[in-house]
Amino acid sequence: MNKIQFILIVIICVLFGLIFPFVLPERFYADARPIVLDLYNEKGLIGSYPFTMLFYWITGLGKLPFSIVALIQLPILFFLLWLIGIPNRFAQINIKNCLIYLSFLMVSVFIGQPSKEFITFIFAAIIVYLFQYKYFS
């Protein structure tokens, strides 16, 4: 039941990620515009914004509409969460799980667009995943 609940929430969040760029005001995408447009050609390896601009330029995600970016990025993030593990009581409705469900919705808003947080989330998830093995911990 936990896995079914997780998959259901992931599907809902990805659908919200597809819809939000058409519904939310422009201020929600204030960080995404400079990353995608790169008006001053700041791409590079040093600094968070230049690295993010380089990442989205190399992958081509910066040229796609935000809803398509959400369709690509969100399943990657939720797959990383799946690899880390789903809690045993994830399907139970309680305050802690409701906060987790709401945080998943916030992820669909703020990471379903070109952002530095997408890259940060990937690195953090990889570190957590590696430390779950006794070989690395």
Predicted segments, located by residue:
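Hydrophobic transmembrane helix bundles of membrane-integrated enzymes that assemble
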Residues: 1-28, 33-137
